[in-house]
Each structure stands twice: as structure tokens, then as C-alpha cells.
């Protein structure tokens, strides 16, 4: 049995706090489509920022490859979301869920930035596993069900399998580096 998930380091703890707090906040508050767009863009930007940090700090090829994929894929989702909200003439609206997401990410980035070498690699990939678990949960359980616009809902449904693939990739890398 893999006991590493039982000993959650500080960085992953923050991501797990997001897992349990952001989805609950989103479920308790009906989000409008502009608010959903804001959460989606924020969630993708957060992971791009994590990836850039990993690209600057890690020397591990598995981590670097994973980070490149995250930066590229999540930027692609942001580009699609921006194109959609532009087409729909909708402005993403900041809200409690997107604000909490960004605040938690700032804390996580600071914690990650304080680490180096193998400790950084482990903390980064542990965070990525927890973060993608949280994002999959929010997209699946909150954002898709609450989306009113068919095109926004379709975009979220299209992105969900990619997020699940990211989670699987993160778990694989975590196993390779001893996460």
C-alpha cells in the first residue's frame, strides 16, 4: 500500500484544503457563467504558474516534462476560454471561489519556492496530484452542473478528460520519483 498520501506535506495540504474548501464553496453558492469562467481561467493560470516554477527550479527530467505539458495544455484551455467568453461577449467575474483559489495558490507557490532539489520535486508533484484531484472534483461536481450556457458546458466537458489525464500523469511521475 502506498502510504505517501497519508503523510501529506505542507504544500499538498494546501492543495487538499482547496479540494475540500473550494468545491464546498462552489456547491453552496450558485455560480453564474461569468463566475464559472473566472474559476476556470484562475484554475488554469494557477497550474501554469506552478509549472513555470517547476521549470525554473527542477533538474528532474520527469518533472520538467510534466511541467512543460501542464504549461502548454493549461494555456490552451485559457485560450479556448478567452475565445469563448469573447464570442459570447461575457466578462469573467471574480468571485469567492476564484479568489480562494488564487490566495491558496499564492501560499503554495511560496512554500514550493522555499524548497530545492529532490524536496522541491516531491513537493511539486505531490501538489500537482492533489491539485488535479481538486480541479477534477470542482469541474465535474460543480462547474459542469452549474453551467447554463451550452458552449461553456461543452468546453468544460471537453477539458475534463484532459484534466484526468494530467492527474494520471502526475500520479505516474509521483511514483517514479518516490512520491
List each language-model region with its residue ranges.
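His/Met- and acidic-residue-enriched segments that coordinate or traffic transition-metal cofactors
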Residues: 2-12, 18-179
Amino acid at each position: 500500500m502506498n502510504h505517501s498520501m497519508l503523510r501529506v506535506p505542507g504544500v499538498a495540504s494546501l492543495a487538499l484544503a482547496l479540494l475540500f474548501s473550494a468545491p464546498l464553496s462552489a456547491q453552496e453558492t450558485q455560480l453564474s457563467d461569468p463566475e464559472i469562467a473566472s474559476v476556470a481561467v484562475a484554475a488554469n493560470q494557477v497550474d501554469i504558474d506552478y509549472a513555470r516554477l517547476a521549470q525554473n527550479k527542477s533538474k528532474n527530467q520527469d518533472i520538467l516534462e510534466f511541467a512543460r505539458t501542464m504549461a502548454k495544455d493549461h494555456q490552451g484551455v485559457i485560450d479556448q476560454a478567452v475565445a469563448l467568453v469573447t464570442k459570447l461577449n461575457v466578462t469573467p467575474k471574480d468571485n469567492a471561489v476564484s479568489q480562494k483559489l488564487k490566495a491558496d495558490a499564492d501560499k503554495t507557490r511560496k512554500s514550493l519556492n522555499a524548497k530545492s532539489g529532490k524536496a522541491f520535486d516531491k513537493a511539486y508533484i505531490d501538489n500537482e496530484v492533489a491539485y488535479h484531484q481538486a480541479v477534477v472534483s470542482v469541474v465535474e461536481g460543480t462547474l459542469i452542473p452549474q453551467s447554463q450556457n451550452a458552449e461553456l458546458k461543452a468546453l468544460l466537458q471537453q477539458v475534463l478528460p484532459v484534466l484526468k489525464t494530467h492527474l494520471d500523469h502526475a500520479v505516474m511521475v509521483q511514483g517514479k520519483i518516490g512520491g
